[in-house]
């Protein structure tokens, strides 16, 4: 650190500052806006006590430096010094303190990491999920903050408290706040980030008022406007959908290809790989397809054994029809998400002529209309719209669906990384034995609560046959511990001693899962449209989990809505606090290794279907105790209170002792402080996954790198929010353990991307300026001889591109949806088509740039114009004659 280039001439302006002073300031707030840490900045000018926020908020520290001409500032989280005049990180030289100074050590260059960049750091596997258990946390742990009821907002408060106690999500907003960037209104992610910071701040109040998020959700969905009671599950879906939309980023093509290769290799190793089996692969989209015979998973004989084994295990036919009817009544009324709650059985959609069909999976799409609804969909799972992130597709479906003009872009976000899983559905025609496969992404599982008859069927069939399989529902109780087992035994004994007409049947969460995954007979009004038979046939539907989410959200269907009335199912459903085992419900193709879950939070509803009150029980990640969150009141409760609760929504998190050992290993390596010649940059977001996920997946540095290996120019100004520096030993351990990458030792702005950005900006300006010029000339024409028609769907894509709202240009002009081709070959405009009118010059310009078609021209000859004028004159004379 003694190089001349590292010396800053402004160091003489620093006053007497001790490290204790800075630690004390780090516990304060920004003097301008009042926001708390982390990453506050303190001015080092002699005599100045200013503390301001950084770029993650308003950046009052920079505003202060510019206004007061104070050059040096220190980050109160990392203790790194930045000089605004030199525009670089500087290091304090180790000059000794004056004789009059106290024994407190003065800040020197030894107090700062030796790095060329003022990077903020994420704790590596510190304690439990990065939470420091200080003495203050032992007295009153962080996170125990209530929320004020803003007029029947208990449904929102309960949901927010449950999400707040999901460590992977909360740690992202606390530790990776710089990644929370969006230009989409109402910027709900910013409101949520602020709320989480308030809930988990050391200097937290007893309760907060979530007014910003409350008003933001009302702008998004009219359903939540007003002050009437709403469904907490509806709120959860709306909130997480919006957070995903605001935080989503495209998945790099290289990542998609690597994931596909890895999963293909895994399938080849596990199954031996036949031609039919190769149809299953990983790709973009949440699409679905079907294959002949055993085209989905395994051979046809294996399919038949799996499916026929489950026939007759499901709910009664009467209950199925009722479920389908009720599911329609429970759809959302929002215009943007009108069908998102519907339990759609996508496998019963009438199929096209080929052997595969593609399911609409992007968020802008709506589900296909169907007449039949099955209890097996996970509401539906995420049927409208399904997310594209981390979803699967059948290669056969992709090939036969026809080439797309624009390649489908996969998106991911912290929401999809945490909550998204996938389900494999199989539908078999009982006449020709044809099997179709459907792979869908879900964000939550909406489970039916089986009745007395259905429960008896489940216990007599599924539980008996499951004994011969690897893993049973009963295995999920093995990890609960003796206390939980004993309490559960007592509860079952008490229930058995009381007549069933008084108490009702004993229902477990495993029973609800078994009912959800049980085979569904497709017959009567619910017959299956078989492509091979070309008619409706009896069939059977069977589904399994293909990929488990990091946090499993389970919704119990307690509310039923009939035509004339609604009612609530008040049956108690027992659920395990630890060791929920989903292995019995996994497909052979499942890519998840960890299958056990521990409970994080449960939302309960007290009252009837028309009115009531929501509360939540959550386990604090710091001390492991359970607390009741009832609006602004937070009370510690015993775990037996939680187990006896009337659960409505449950949040389970993957549990893994191996992941804990991995974190401790990394902590040990980091503490050794072995000197290495190289330091490595790693994605801050992935490191947060390592700290909080049971299965973080391969290292992914693409979040801050472009395809050329550099930093995209638009990310360089906040690169310190995206990366963390690791010692060589820690990087090598993580890389050898998880793979991925790429390795990064040097950060630089990508010059290739800079040239591409400038060229793209020039292209956008040229196209929009040319269009405006030609369109003005077109508007000035009084009687154009020809008018060209263009599809507004394509035009809106082009407009979004030239206005920089979409990074990718549109494909070729596509007028197929507004064109009608006659038998003579003449192309005409469809009646009622969504089109726009442009001039011939504008059409030729766009056609030369993008190509496409077909051309739709409306020509007006002079004869036609004169004939129209003559007819108009005759009508005028006739009208005057009648008036006379």
From Swiss-Prot:
Keywords: Cytoplasm, Cytoskeleton, Endocytosis, Hydrolase, Metal-binding, Protease, Repeat, Thiol protease, Ubl conjugation pathway, Zinc, Zinc-finger. Residues 128-138 have a biased composition (Acidic residues). Residues 95-142, 247-296, 368-388 are annotated as: Disordered. It is found in: Cytoplasm, Perinuclear region; Cytoplasm, Cytoskeleton, Microtubule organizing center, Centrosome. The UBP-type zinc finger binds 3 zinc ions. However, it does not bind ubiquitin, probably because the conserved Arg in position 55 is replaced by a Glu residue. This is Ubiquitin carboxyl-terminal hydrolase 20. GO terms for cellular component: centrosome; perinuclear region of cytoplasm. Its main location: cytoplasm. Belongs to the peptidase C19 family. USP20/USP33 subfamily. SUPFAM superfamilies: Cysteine proteinases, DUSP-like, RING/U-box.
């Amino acid at each position: 650190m003694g190089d001349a280039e590292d010396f800053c001439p402004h160091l003489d302006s620093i006053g007497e500052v001790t490290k204790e002073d800075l630690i004390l300031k780090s516990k304060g707030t920004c003097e301008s806006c009042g926001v708390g840490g982390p990453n506050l900045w303190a001015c080092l000018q002699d005599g100045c006590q200013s503390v301001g926020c950084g770029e993650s908020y308003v950046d009052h520290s920079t505003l202060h430096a510019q206004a007061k001409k104070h050059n040096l500032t220190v980050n109160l989280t990392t203790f790194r010094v930045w000089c605004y005049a030199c525009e670089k990180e500087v290091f304090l030289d180790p000059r000794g303190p004056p004789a009059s100074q106290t024994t407190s050590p003065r800040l020197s260059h030894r107090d700062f990491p030796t790095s060329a960049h003022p990077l903020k750091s994420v704790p590596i596997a510190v304690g439990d999920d990065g939470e420091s258990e200080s003495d203050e946390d032992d007295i009153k742990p962080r996170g125990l903050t209530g929320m004020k009821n803003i007029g029947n907002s208990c449904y929102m408060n309960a949901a927010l408290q449950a999400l707040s106690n999901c460590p992977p999500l909360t740690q992202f907003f606390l530790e990776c706040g710089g990644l929370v960037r969006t230009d989409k209104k109402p910027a709900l992610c910013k409101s949520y980030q602020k709320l989480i910071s308030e809930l988990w701040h050391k200097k937290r109040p007893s309760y907060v008022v979530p007014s910003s998020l409350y008003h933001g959700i009302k702008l998004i969905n009219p359903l939540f406007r007003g002050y009437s009671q709403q469904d907490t599950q509806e709120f959860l879906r709306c909130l997480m959908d919006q957070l995903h939309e605001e935080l989503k980023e495209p998945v790099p093509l290289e990542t998609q290809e690597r994931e596909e290769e890895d999963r293909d290799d895994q399938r080849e190793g596990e199954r031996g790989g036949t031609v039919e089996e190769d149809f299953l692969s990983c790709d973009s989209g949440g699409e679905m397809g079907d294959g002949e015979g055993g085209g989905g998973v395994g051979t046809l004989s294996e399919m038949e054994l799996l499916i026929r084994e489950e026939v007759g295990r499901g709910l009664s036919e009467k209950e199925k029809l009722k479920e389908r009817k009720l599911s329609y009544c429970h759809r959302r009324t929002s215009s943007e998400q009108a069908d998102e709650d519907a339990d759609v059985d996508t496998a019963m959609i009438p199929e096209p002529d080929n052997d595969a069909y593609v399911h609409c999976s992007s968020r802008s799409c709506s589900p296909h209309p169907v007449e039949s609804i099955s209890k097996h969909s996970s509401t539906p799972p995420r049927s409208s719209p399904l997310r594209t992130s981390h979803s699967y597709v059948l290669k056969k479906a992709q090939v036969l669906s026809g080439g797309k003009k624009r390649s489908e872009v996969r998106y991911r976000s912290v929401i999809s990384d945490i909550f998204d899983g996938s389900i494999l559905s199989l539908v078999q025609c009982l006449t020709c034995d044809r099997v179709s496969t459907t792979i869908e992404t879900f964000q939550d599982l909406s489970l039916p609560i089986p009745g007395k008859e259905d429960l008896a069927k489940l216990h007599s069939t599924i539980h008996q046959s499951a004994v011969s399989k690897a893993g049973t529902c009963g295995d999920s109780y093995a990890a609960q511990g003796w206390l939980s087992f004993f309490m559960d035994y007592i509860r079952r004994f008490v229930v058995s001693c009381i007549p069933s007409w008084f108490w009702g049947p004993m229902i477990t969460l495993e029973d609800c899962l078994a009912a959800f995954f049980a085979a569904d007979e497709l017959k009567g009004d619910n017959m299956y449209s078989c492509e091979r038979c070309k008619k409706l046939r009896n069939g059977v539907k069977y589904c399994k989990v293909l990929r488990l989410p990091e946090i499993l959200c389970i919704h119990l269907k307690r509310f039923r809505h009939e035509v004339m009335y609604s009612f609530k199912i008040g049956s108690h459903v027992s659920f395990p606090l630890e060791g929920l085992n989903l292995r019995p419900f996994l497909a052979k193709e499942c890519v998840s290794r960890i299958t056990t879950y521990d409970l994080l939070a449960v939302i309960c509803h007290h009252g009837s279907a028309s009115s009531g009150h929501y509360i939540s029980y959550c386990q604090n990640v710091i001390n492991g105790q359970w607390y009741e969150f009832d609006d602004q009141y937070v009370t510690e409760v015993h775990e037996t209170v939680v187990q006896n609760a009337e659960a409505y929504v449950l949040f389970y998190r993957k549990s893994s002792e191996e992941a804990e050992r991995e974190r401790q290993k990394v902590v040990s390596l980091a503490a050794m402080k072995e000197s290495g010649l190289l330091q490595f940059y790693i994605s801050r977001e992935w490191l947060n996954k390592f700290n909080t996920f049971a299965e973080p997946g391969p290292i992914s540095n693409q979040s801050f790198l472009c395809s050329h290996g550099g930093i995209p120019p638009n990310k360089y100004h906040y690169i310190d929010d995206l990366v963390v520096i690791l010692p060589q030993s820690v990087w090598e351990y993580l890389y050898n353990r998880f793979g991925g990458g790429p390795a990064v030792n040097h950060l630089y702005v990508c010059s290739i991307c800079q040239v591409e950005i400038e060229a793209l900006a020039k292209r956008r300006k040229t196209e929009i300026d040319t269009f405006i010029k030609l369109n003005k000339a077109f508007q000035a024409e009084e009687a154009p001889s020809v008018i060209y028609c263009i599809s507004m769907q394509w035009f809106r894509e082009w407009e979004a591109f030239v206005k920089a709202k979409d990074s990718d240009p549109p494909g070729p002009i596509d007028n197929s949806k507004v064109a009608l081709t006659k038998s003579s070959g003449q192309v005409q405009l469809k009646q009622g088509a969504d089109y726009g009118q442009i001039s011939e010059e504008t059409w030729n310009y766009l056609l030369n740039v993008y190509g496409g078609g077909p051309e739709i021209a409306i020509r007006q000859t002079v004869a036609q114009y004169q004939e129209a004028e003559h007819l108009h004159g005759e009508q005028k004379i006739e009208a005057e004659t009648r008036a006379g």
